[in-house]
Amino acid sequence: MSGLDVRGAVSFAERTKSVDALTKKEILSALNSGEVSETSEDARFRVRELVLPDGESYSGSLLGNVPEGPGKYIWSDGCVYDGEWRRGMRHGIGNMRWASGASYDGEFSGGYMHGSGTYVDANKLTYKGRWRLNLKHGLGYQVYPNGDVFEGSWIQGLGEGPGKYTWANKNVYLGDMKGGKMSGKGTLTWVTGDSYEGSWLNGMMHGVGVYTWSDGGCYVGTWTRGLKDGKGSFYSAGTRVPVVQEFYLNALRKRGVLPDMRRQNQVASSVNMENLRVGVNRNKLSKGSLINLEQSRNGRVSLERRWSLEVSIEKVIGHGYSDLSTAVLDSGSSVQYKANIPILEREYMQGVLISELVVNNGFSRTSRRAKRKHKRLVKEAKKPGEVVIKGHRSYDLMLSLQLGIRYTVGKITPIQRRQVRTADFGPRASFWMTFPRAGSTMTPPHHSEDFKWKDYCPMVFRNLREMFKIDAADYMMSICGNDTLRELSSPGKSGSVFFLSQDDRFMIKTLRKSEVKVLLRMLPDYHHHVKTYENTLITKFFGLHRIKPSSGQKFRFVVMGNMFFTDLRIHRRFDLKGSSLGRSADKVEIDENTILKDLDLNYSFFLETSWREGLLRQLEIDSKFLEAQNIMDYSLLLGVHHRAPQHLRSQLVRSQSITTDALESVAEDDTIEDDMLSYHEGLVLVPRGSENTVTGPHIRGSRLRASAVGDEEVDLLLPGTARLQIQQGVNMPARAELIPGREDKEKQILHDCCDVVLYLGIIDILQEYNMTKKIEHAYKSLHFDSLSISAVDPTFYSQRFLEFIKKVFPQNNKS
């Protein structure tokens, strides 16, 4: 589903395309058979018919030499506008008819469809609602040629915000939309009686949700891109959902994690199309806008139930654990709940069932175990970080940061692109701007306190953003859009504050003054290094700024690319330096957001031989660069996404064989079975594709090649996801094997050998080996092994770092 994209790239001349180029004398001479009557002393004429030299004609009122008041304009290609004019542009109530058969009836302003109006295209797609500058904007009601209907909020030509989409087959979605797709919180109800309420992303179930079948069974858990992913609970038909679970679901609705049906119904009822008054007694519109109006997009909300195969399997498996013949009554009778029917606690990995625990339906209201379980589920459902909202300690700081970045990018983007010069580097290549709360001639009013904004080397960072193909508008929307940032707890000892953009593309970190000086000093060499080595694994920097509130300390920020921006779930995160002193996580409870360290790593990762050689070569180049800059204390940030282990894939095969008969009664997408069966082969590499390939937002360089497909460039194909582009440090498939003797280091979620996808890069590259670090080295060497501490000179640090990384990625003798 998508709205018509009528982006009016209409010039002023096109919007006034009529008789404004003719003088009054020429108008009179053009009237071969028409008539002109003087209607007032202000030179207003009433033209019966004026034939222009190019074959187009106008009849109506003129003021001077432009249309003013009611008039009709006919273009040479058959397009007709009949309605009100002002200063030569369509303005007021009017009707426009295209040669293709499309028409618009409604309000115009300044030559654009603007206000309330009804548009019908040549294929009988009908939209009735609000317009803004030729785009659907506001409340609107659209009927598609196939009978689908969407009513709700539109922004810039696309469904955005609360709305209701009804398919021709009577399936209904009620909830949030974004970019014309189901995104946010919403409920989809099928005509069969099944329903899903929860979070959506790009038209797919994504996040916490509840899937309920028509027979009363339900699954409460998390999804990733349409597939179950993580822990959840399955309640078969006839099972009463525990009171604690009901409290948990209600709490999620209050917090906005699940959709609030009462609120959605209120929103839906408020979208009353009868209240959208559209004037139809006059006809109007401009030709320049019409051409773009024809270019409608055919994208629509996808209703393919790509999860329904596993749903059917789940039904049968769940029924297999208990005699449901005693729980399911004859049709038409009320449901009876059986306390002895078990509840299935399950864990999935990207749609694959990896563990299952049968528990008795005997939760009490005051069960401590149940409360702990649901408190843990709520914690797992949350995104990493703390949402910065009004009242948060960092709220004013976030507002100032967003306002400053918006100002900086808006100021520098119009400047013509050019090569970076020597004068663009250094502390002097910066500018100040004061942002008073009430606003100024240069800055808008805002809700934060007065502050001063300093932007360092804006031309250099603009060049870096362009180098990584980051669009200026996307950059601003990601950091400074309507969504707030999330504050992350500092994983290290620096005490830095970390912000994460809501779309997870960018990290923002506070820096010490000394770190800013280091970055400015090394920025020319950093820029040259990144430009020369497009596969570099060093942190990508996109902006350096400083905020000085009117009352308070200075804050210095650097904007970086998030190395873990991916649709795949990062199950483990490691910060690896090669040292051993104090290099283990001190958290008792380890979750997916815990940053583990060198001594916590109990797996080796085996890559294809050529990939390993390329990775180690690039790491050596990068570490030598940092050594030349007198930098130490950096680390390799490693993210691990793991797939289902081999021995569990056979369980899926057995489950599918059990459910052969049951699947016949469910309408499925035939491709799903093939997708799920592909797990048996582990990670699948396919020759590179030109379409539907997901790339990272900050990726440069060539793709990796695989000997298995004739040394061609390859993509990674995973069930339930798009093709992932494999590059150095991004979407790298590997085999993880347990290191002997390290089995009990942490609770194992991986197995002895399993498939993984790796994400990695070098971070924390702003620590010089200065006098402070030299003193730290001397002091710690008196108490500990000098080779085990982090504070060592850059040359030794680089050597030790590379030796350790070689052990993490040993030579693959099986490839």
Swiss-Prot record:
**Gene3D superfamilies assigned:** 2-Layer Sandwich, Histone H3 K4-specific methyltransferase SET7/9 N-terminal domain, Phosphatidylinositol Phosphate Kinase II Beta
What InterPro entries does its record include?
MORN (IPR003409), PIno-4-P-5_kinase_pln (IPR017163), PInositol-4-P-4/5-kinase_C_sf (IPR027483), PInositol-4-P-4/5-kinase_core (IPR002498), PInositol-4-P-5-kinase_N (IPR027484), PInositol-4/5-P-5/4-kinase (IPR023610)
Question: Top-level EC class, please?
Answer: transferase
Give the reaction(s) catalysed: a 1,2-diacyl-sn-glycero-3-phospho-(1D-myo-inositol 4-phosphate) + ATP = a 1,2-diacyl-sn-glycero-3-phospho-(1D-myo-inositol-4,5-bisphosphate) + ADP + H(+)
Q: Work out whether the entry's keyword set contains Transmembrane helix.
A: no
Instruction: Extract the Pfam families matched here.
Output: MORN (PF02493), PIP5K (PF01504)
GO CC term (a single one) = nucleus
The main location is: membrane
Tissues expressed in: Widely expressed.
The answer to keyword ATP-binding applying to this record is yes
Topological category with respect to the lipid bilayer: Peripheral membrane protein
Q: Which keywords fit this entry according to its UniProt record? A: ATP-binding, Kinase, Membrane, Nucleotide-binding, Nucleus, Repeat, Transferase
What other note does the entry give for this protein? Answer: The gain-of-function mutant pip5k9-d (T-DNA insertion line) has reduced primary root length.
Subunit structure and binding partners: Interacts with CINV1.
This chain's function reads: Plays a role in sugar-mediated root development. Interaction with CINV1 induces repression of CINV1 activity and negative regulation of sugar-mediated root cell elongation.
What is the official name of this protein in its record? Phosphatidylinositol 4-phosphate 5-kinase 9
